[in-house]
Amino acid sequence: MVYFSDIFNVDESILESYGAMNISLLNDIPLFIDPFLLYASEKPEYRQLHENILDYLSFLRDKASGFISSEKIKRWYTFPEVKQNWLGYSESGNGGLGLGKDFGQSMSKAIQGVFPDLKNEKITETSHLEKLSLFKVGVGRDNISDFTCNLIKKYLLEYTQTFAMQYLSLEQCKNIAVSKVYFDYKYENWMSQKYILPYFNGDYVILTPKDLLTKDETWINASEMRHRLLDITSSLPNDELRDQINDIYLKQLTKKKITNKLMNEAAANTIARFPILMDYYIKIKEEEKENAKNVSKEVVLSVDEVFIR
């Protein structure tokens, strides 16, 4: 047996009532954290985590207006993968690439253009980290999930420590100094902190709440945005702009054989020309936030049944 409940001799019902995923400690489970679920939640602590992410993005955006040295990019943008949560798509074990120099450089160059109205949005209810993945700036789904996991790591560590102190013996845990736990805005640096955490096979373990997890794609994603271009365009309040965008999109589909690839390329070209469409797409996704929570429940249940039960 390789699951957390087996290794630490905890009944599955205890993990279930706590709300934590019963992770495998042999291979990653194909789930990841979707930051949209923080925004969509009614839990005050999740909504605060969403705000904390925006605060850090605001810090990065403001700093991006000047010169950023490679040392600061490394300090502010690069993170190791939080492999101790045993989530992701590794074929064996729980190793991953994390967020390295390429991610840091891509994001530092893009952040001002992607978030001109950060925390002061005029179309959407709020800002969303996932907007970075809608631009072709070298930031994809895995980057978004890894970045989110690092930005809420303090919460996840506290969540795990609380469980460990309540349900595990001291022999099953270890007092660990974890790096890059929280950001000190006074010193502009990530700080370490100690936690009492479950310990197995030479490393600590992090538990993750089920209601933060999804599979395949984040709720806000570029693939669906391209697929729903006509829906997005129809939601525009400006009739003239809506007609102009439709004309530009349809003129790219004049070939006799209209393929999915051609439609995808036409949608991508149109969105690149009218980036305001991204904001209206995000607005639609905000309005559908209850569906995001339902999808999360369904995919977590399906993974639970296939990989655990």
Language-model features: where?
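Long, contiguous, compositionally biased segments that the model treats as domain-scale units
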Residues: 1-171
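The feature marks a conserved, polyanion-engaging helical scaffold used by nucleic-acid processing enzymes
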Residues: 176, 180-309
